[in-house]
A protein has these predicted regions:
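Bacterial N-terminal signal peptides that target proteins for export
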Residues: 1-8
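Electrostatic cytochrome c docking/interface patches
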Residues: 19-39
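The canonical Cys-X-X-Cys-His
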Residues: 36-50, 116, 120
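C-terminal motif of bacterial Sec signal peptides marking the signal peptidase cleavage site
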Residues: 14-17
Length: 124
């Protein structure tokens, strides 16, 4: 009988770890989005976190696809994100300073830019 209590406790811990409050699964990325994720990890992650409410230097990218759709009248989320990469001085988020390199978008190939925008659009 003395071994059943620890086994019960272990089972309870395992079940608690498998609860419905776990983190949502990462969406499956297509090839274009994977290219963008690689660009993000290499060129963006040093300044932009993926965790909500986490500031490294620039604003967090958590939820950017949703927020970008409401930033500028006449721009959908993709257009806003692309423009903010190509001409970062045009759209500085309130509370942040203009530190994004102005030539950043010019250093990306067309495929890298398309991929980066596609990847950021998965961050809802």
């Amino acid at each position: 009988m003395k071994y059943k209590i620890p086994l019960f406790v272990l089972a309870a811990i395992v079940l608690a770890a498998c609860s419905a409050t776990s983190i949502a699964p990462t969406p499956t990325l297509d090839a274009v989005q994977q290219t963008g994720q690689a660009v993000y990890n290499l060129r963006c992650a040093q300044c932009h976190a993926l965790a909500p409410d986490t500031v490294v230097i620039g604003p967090s990218m958590a939820g950017i696809a949703t927020r970008a759709a409401t930033r500028v009248d006449g721009y959908d989320a993709e257009a806003y994100i692309e423009r903010s990469i190509l001409v970062p001085k045009d759209y500085i988020v309130a509370g942040f300073v203009d530190t994004m390199p102005t030539n950043f978008g010019k250093e990306l190939t067309s495929a890298e830019l398309t991929g980066l925008v596609a990847y950021l659009m998965t961050l809802k």
